[in-house]
Amino acid sequence: MLDANKLQQAVDQAYTQFHSLNGGQNADYIPFLANVPGQLAVVAIVTCDGNVYSAGDSDYRFALESISKVCTLALALEDVGPQAVQDKIGADPTGLPFNSVIALELHGGKPLSPLVNAGAIATTSLINAENIEQRWQRILHIQQQLAGEQVALSDEVNQSEQTTNFHNRAIAWLLYSAGYLYCDAMEACDVYTRQCSTLINTVELATLGATLAAGGLNPLTHKRVLQADNVPYILAEMMMEGLYGRSGDWAYRVGLPGKSGVGGGILAVVPGVMGIAAFSPPLDEEGNSVRGQKMVASVAKQLGYNVFKG
């Protein structure tokens, strides 16, 4: 049994130490994100037995952004299986910025990773669907199953992104021209943009992590969301590419599968134990929450969790 007092103390200490840390700036290329109050900071744990611990304004809802890639990857694995995902998308870190097209040019149009923009758009196109709305509803539903029923599309975020996503549209057409997109290019880009535009809070984000930690069983709803055999593939991708250019550094220092988003959210998974999540809008140059990284790493270190420790 996990010690409840110890878990709450770890969360409280991480929050106290880092919630006012200076550094970084909000993503400014998406108007909605540029206007989120920069002083916000939250950290939370959800355990595999369904207990919740948090510090900060855990009710504040923020844009899921790139963390949505984890959910869509999970659905693709359920739909087509791990071999098809590896063959059609890839399972390798790019070593490049999350929105780069260089890897596409170097590898014949194959995106390599489902956790960078090119691979994520391709993954969205892999989802079994007869039309754009079915594709979108299935992705929204998996987000809700993994994290909580309150996860919903923000029209304000979506509008802000749909009017500025020219680079992703270009990526979609590059994928299409190379034969690595599996539906209409603008359908894939539209749905991908929507999946990034849902709102979530930090406890729900930690619940997503706890669901992965529990092998696909949501510890709060007690419903199986994913086949247990598919979860290791998700965690492997998170370890390799979850924090973009910081992924290697994160694996070296923290040693947990993680995923960040430019909305300021960050997630880590302790397999078999818990999900740890944080939110704070100012980002480093790679697009990861400055305070969020520190808070999640602090919780993991205090509790002694690192998958490489054995």
UniProtKB/Swiss-Prot annotation:
Pfam family, one: Glutaminase
Annotated protein name in UniProt: Glutaminase
Hydrolase among keywords: yes
NCBIfam families noted in UniProt: Gln_ase, PRK12356.1
A biological process from GO: glutamine catabolic process
Subunit comment: Homotetramer.
Keyword Hydrolase: yes
Catalytic class of the enzyme: hydrolase
Similarity comment: Belongs to the glutaminase family.
Residues given in the record as substrate binding sites: S66, N117, E161, N168, Y192, Y244, V262
Membrane spanning residue stretches: none
Catalyses which reaction(s): L-glutamine + H2O = L-glutamate + NH4(+)
An example molecular function term from Gene Ontology annotations: glutaminase activity
